[in-house]
Amino acid sequence: MPAAWPPRTVIRKSSGLRTLESALYRAGLGPVAGVDEVGRGACAGPLVVAACVLGPNRLESLAALDDSKKLNENERERLFPLIRRYALAYHVVFIPSQEVDRRGVHVANIEGMRRAVAGLSLRPGYVLSDGFRVPGLPMPSLPVVGGDAAAACIAAASVLAKVSRDRLMVAMEDEHPGYGFAEHKGYSTRAHSAALARLGPSSQHRYSFINVRRLVMDGEPEEHGEVGCGKMLVDMPVDGVLHEGQLSR
């Protein structure tokens, strides 16, 4: 029986994105799935979680893979169809804002990771998650701090989640005009705060986030910066899922 944890390979940042996965494959623990999320800090829109399995060999077509936050929009859009083409399996899960409110963002994140892994058409032998331990998986797993910059399968999942969520937020602009979702993607900006104060929260906003909840409670928007949307105040379920072959391009 293979070991539950990867061999104690020394992984240096300069080693490249495939080093950890390669060690797992050599130990007989493949296929290796990476899982990552996008949208934890947004106060509107879904939390999106992706799982992705890449083959054991490095592909030149995916050489530009990196943490999706380090890639610009054009780079992510170029990689998105390539990942879908060359991945052995992938699965993208959308956790709606109502479920984030009901469960709390961390619990919703972990549940989303479980769903994403469970939805893969190829059962992984090992799962690498970005930063968080994912209890309840039926296979061994390892949280990797900064995983989207340390493992190719996590980086691929990061790009799938980011592009899927960004496209959804752009489409959401037509359904909820005036909030600027196409620009800020549901994250907190001055323009978003001004729209919230003017229009009030939409059905896509997370009422458990303090800056949204305060508008409901007393009509006063919270002052905040550009990157977060305030802390959660409380710990509902329709689940959207992107399977292989869905979402154009």
Swiss-Prot record:
Cofactor annotation remark: Manganese or magnesium. Binds 1 divalent metal ion per monomer in the absence of substrate. May bind a second metal ion after substrate binding.
Start and end residues of each RNase H type-2 domain: 30-221
GO molecular function: manganese ion binding; RNA binding; RNA-DNA hybrid ribonuclease activity
Subcellular location: Cytoplasm
Claim: Nuclease is one of the keywords in the record: yes
Gene Ontology cellular-component annotations: cytoplasm; ribonuclease H2 complex
Catalytic activity: Endonucleolytic cleavage to 5'-phosphomonoester
NCBIfam families for this protein: PRK00015.1-3, PRK00015.2-2, PRK00015.2-4
Keyword Nucleotide-binding: no
Domain of life: Bacteria
Record-stated family: Belongs to the RNase HII family.
Name of the protein: Ribonuclease HII
